[in-house]
């Protein structure tokens, strides 16, 4: 499943959901609080880590604040993301042809739609893209998953390359 939607609300959470994915018990509460505290935020992302085979947390990924240059090199935004529903609609939502990297494709198009905000993610003094620096997503490592090996799903790399190529083609 690629997206969880809060249908009645204004927020969409494109979240890669796997049977072994775990959210921190307070993850949705922290996201809701952040949305309430930062009503102008268009996109909110969090830090994450992995769970080893024994279920122990490891490999924390403490992400930087918004960096358009880094996004072009990799999808550092990751898995737990909240985006304004209108923004997802404005960029056309998920595209089937980027299966395996739909989230990266969507993030690249959102950044472009927002005018590629400068580092820090602020537009007109308001937080357009906000980093919530808390580990709220735990990704279980297992064989056959990109959580264990970036080469586990070659089609995802190809889809990511296609998404980036399209983003750069429209930008330049």
Residue ranges and their predicted role:
Residues 1-2, 6, 24, 62, ...:
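Non-catalytic membrane-proximal stalk/linker segments that position and tether the catalytic domains
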Residues 3, 9-22:
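Short beta-strand-to-loop acidic/aromatic patch adjacent to the donor-nucleotide binding site
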Residues 3, 43, 129-131:
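Conserved beta-strand scaffold positions in the cores of enzyme catalytic domains, especially
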């Amino acid at each position: 499943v690629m997206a969880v939607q809060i249908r009645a609300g204004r927020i969409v959470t494109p979240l890669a959901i796997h049977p072994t994915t775990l959210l921190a018990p307070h993850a949705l509460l922290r996201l809701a609080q952040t949305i309430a505290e930062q009503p102008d935020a268009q996109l909110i992302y969090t830090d994450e880590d992995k769970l080893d085979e024994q279920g122990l947390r490891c490999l924390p990924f403490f992400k930087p604040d918004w960096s358009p240059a880094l996004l072009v090199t990799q999808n550092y935004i990751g898995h737990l993301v909240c985006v304004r529903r209108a923004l997802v609609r404005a960029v056309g939502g998920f595209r089937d042809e980027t299966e395996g990297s739909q989230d990266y494709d969507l993030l690249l198009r959102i950044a472009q739609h927002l005018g590629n905000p400068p580092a820090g993610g602020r537009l007109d003094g308001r937080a357009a893209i906000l980093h919530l620096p808390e580990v709220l997503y735990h990704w279980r490592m297992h064989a056959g998953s990109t959580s264990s090996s970036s080469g586990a799903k070659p089609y995802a790399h190809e889809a990511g390359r296609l998404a980036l190529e399209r983003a750069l083609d429209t930008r330049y």
